[in-house]
């Protein structure tokens, strides 16, 4: 059974994905997500922080992610891009969540929505990103 926090992360990634694909305004996307039947199982506060925070800072997050990629960021699968952006926000703005939890959750969300080996790609990028964003925390491994 998925936790409310996992469901919030999944919904936030779906919302970011919609914004990447449809270019719909964030409030409209959030409204549509909240109307989904299983939104009641999510942590609404976490969803709001993840989705709106990612939307607000997406350009900055792309700048952090771009040097770590082995391809042009425009060639990223939209699901992988949405997962990376959302996890980058969580790493950057939510220090109360340990980075291994953020990476693991991103891997699980990618397994749910992404391609066959997308989770391996996401894991590699987020591991490097965590070392940059939280330089003191990864030393505690």
Swiss-Prot record:
Superkingdom per UniProt: Bacteria
Record's function text: Involved in transcription antitermination. Required for transcription of ribosomal RNA (rRNA) genes. Binds specifically to the boxA antiterminator sequence of the ribosomal RNA (rrn) operons.
Protein name stated in the entry: Transcription antitermination protein NusB
GO molecular function, one term: RNA binding
Pfam name, any one: NusB
GO annotation, cellular component aspect: cytosol
UniProt keyword S-adenosyl-L-methionine, yes or no: no
UniProt family annotation: Belongs to the NusB family.
Gene: nusB
Keywords tagged on the record: RNA-binding, Transcription, Transcription antitermination, Transcription regulation
GO biological process: DNA-templated transcription termination; transcription antitermination
NCBIfam families linked: nusB
Signal sequence, start to end: none
């Amino acid at each position: 059974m998925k936790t409310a926090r996992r469901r919030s992360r999944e919904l936030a990634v779906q919302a970011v994905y919609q914004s990447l694909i449809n270019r719909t305004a964030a409030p409209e996307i959030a409204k549509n997500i909240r109307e989904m039947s299983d939104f009641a199982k999510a942590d609404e506060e976490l969803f709001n922080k993840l989705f709106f925070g990612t939307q607000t800072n997406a350009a900055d997050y792309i700048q952090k992610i771009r040097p770590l990629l082995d391809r042009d960021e425009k060639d990223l699968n939209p699901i992988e891009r949405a997962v990376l952006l959302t996890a980058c926000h969580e790493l950057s703005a939510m220090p109360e969540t340990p980075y291994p939890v953020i990476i693991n959750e991103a891997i699980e969300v990618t397994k749910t929505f992404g391609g066959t080996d997308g989770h391996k790609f996401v894991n590699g990028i987020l591991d490097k990103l965590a070392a940059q964003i939280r330089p003191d925390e990864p030393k505690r491994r």
